[in-house]
Amino acid sequence: MKVTASQLVDLLATTLEDLPKGQFEVMWDSQNYKICRILQEHRRQIDGGTSIQRNVILDRNGRARYRRLFDTDSPTVDQNMKTIDVPWAQIGTDYSWDVLEIMRNRNSEKGFINLLESRRTERMWDLAELIEERGWSAPESATDSLYPYGIPYYINFLNDGETEAGFSGRTIRYSGGTTGTICAGIDAGAEDKWRNYAATRTNVDNAMLRTIRQAIRRTRFRPPPFVQNPGQDGPGTPIEMYAGDVLVNELEDLADRRDDNNTPDDLMGKVLHNYDGAVYINRIPLCYVPQLDTQTVLDGDGNEFSPEALYCVDWSYLQAVVQDGYWMEESEPQTDRGQHTTFTVFLDGSHNNLCINRRRAGFVIHKPIPAAA
């Protein structure tokens, strides 16, 4: 019996909608997919428009005052509002099947489902790796309109030769080797309130723990009770720490040395391990991110330098945003006159990362980056 192209399209479309669990294993590249989880879970935001925009008040002008009876007033209006502007980044993948593959498996339910699911899973895996890779790096340059704004774009290291902790993270180190201070449309070089907290460390010891304590304390801003909090806090635990394997190992070793009994408590007093062995710092989980294993920057002399960074991210203020109606959109199976026996499904989406408050979004602690000799 002849099977028409339209029947094959319908078969592919209806099967793809409700694939059962596959009977094959995948050799994953990454141990964790933190960015992907944020994009797929309740922490993501949904937005529309030609770009992602938010307003932010960066400073005040000291107009409040105590007054005496019958004092005169001098009302003024100050322009302290700035606009955060983040472009959309488009991402996509595709998966294809030849008519002969489909025909050879159409009488075997298991074979047909494995054919469809394995092809889709391989491409979804590729998509996840790309999202994760770019989520832990800055774009190629200040004019790069292809890649999203990864975590290092918003949470910057101290400048070369700087070691004093504070809200001094202002220089974006782009993947292509250039630098800049304009972050999401606002110049951190001119606006000191549009900078993140950064500090340096030498060894993994009590001095580093003190540095972490101070960073946590200084980035936890609480508004006065009579001022409405404009943040977008969501459910669940929004704060996590991230590091590469070398630093995670050293922090776990430090935790073991601090508590021989290995009883479940906090690293600032005793060790607290979760099921996969990562420690907690001030009740904040420390997660291993394989992309940070190979993170390097250029020092003052232009040489590659490994900062071995510890990132802390508050996902209430550094938000993953997807475009309304255009995220993980799967097309109908399509054919092309140049490959008339091939059916292709396209998966597309539009997203980026948005930081609404760089002072509250987290911090980074890294090895001092050498200045130019």
What are these model-derived regions, one by one?
Residues 57-81:
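N-terminal low-complexity, intrinsically disordered segments
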Residues 2-58, 84-373:
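Core alpha/beta structural scaffold of self-assembling particle/tube/pore-forming proteins
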